[in-house]
C-alpha cells in the first residue's frame, strides 16, 4: 500500500551563531506523520507558484503554528504592539490553502494554522487575546470554537 505524503508547513528563523536563515518544522509534526504511516515533507516558505507545485506533490497538508496572522488579511489594521508577523509566510500559506482546496487535498491545522485557515475562509481573529485566556488543565491546550448550525463541523 502506498504511504501518503504529508506536507508540513515550515517556518524560518535565523541561526543564532551566524545569521544564516533556516527553514524548520517542529519535530513532533514529522514524527507524528511517520508514526501514523505517512511520509513527512517540510514545505519551506516560497512563493505562490511554488505553492501550486507543493500541493501537487502531496496527499495532505498540515498548517503548523507560529507567528501572528497579519490583520490586513482579514481587513483590519494592527491594534497590538507586536513584531511577531511573517508576511511572506502568510502569503505563501494562504496560497497553499487555496491550492489545496482547488485540488481537493485535506488540510489539518494547528494553532496559527487554524487561525490562517479561518482567515482564508473569510473569518476574522481577535488580535488582543489577553482577555480571552481560558481556564483548563495545563496538560491540554484548548480554545473554544464556535460553529455554525447545520454544518458538518457542528456535527463532529
Regions found by a protein language model. Name each.
Residues 114:
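The feature captures the ABC ATPase H-loop/switch
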Residues 1-110, 119-121, 126, 130-156:
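N-terminal beta1-alpha1 cap of cysteine-dependent amidohydrolase-like domains
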Amino acid at each position: 500500500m502506498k504511504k501518503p505524503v504529508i506536507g508540513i508547513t515550515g517556518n524560518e528563523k535565523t541561526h543564532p551563531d551566524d545569521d544564516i536563515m533556516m527553514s524548520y518544522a517542529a519535530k513532533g509534526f514529522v514524527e507524528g506523520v511517520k508514526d501514523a504511516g505517512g511520509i513527512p515533507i517540510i514545505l519551506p516558505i516560497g512563493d505562490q507558484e511554488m505553492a501550486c507545485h507543493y500541493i501537487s506533490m502531496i496527499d495532505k497538508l498540515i498548517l503548523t503554528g507560529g507567528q501572528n496572522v497579519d490583520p490586513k488579511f482579514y481587513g483590519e489594521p494592527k491594534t497590538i504592539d507586536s513584531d511577531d508577523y511573517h508576511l511572506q509566510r502568510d502569503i505563501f500559506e494562504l496560497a497553499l490553502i487555496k491550492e489545496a482546496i482547488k485540488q481537493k487535498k485535506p488540510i489539518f491545522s494547528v494553532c496559527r494554522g487554524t487561525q490562517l485557515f479561518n482567515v482564508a475562509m473569510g473569518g476574522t481573529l481577535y488580535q488582543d487575546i489577553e482577555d480571552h485566556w481560558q481556564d483548563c488543565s495545563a496538560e491540554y491546550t484548548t480554545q473554544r470554537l464556535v460553529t455554525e448550525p447545520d454544518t458538518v463541523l457542528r456535527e463532529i
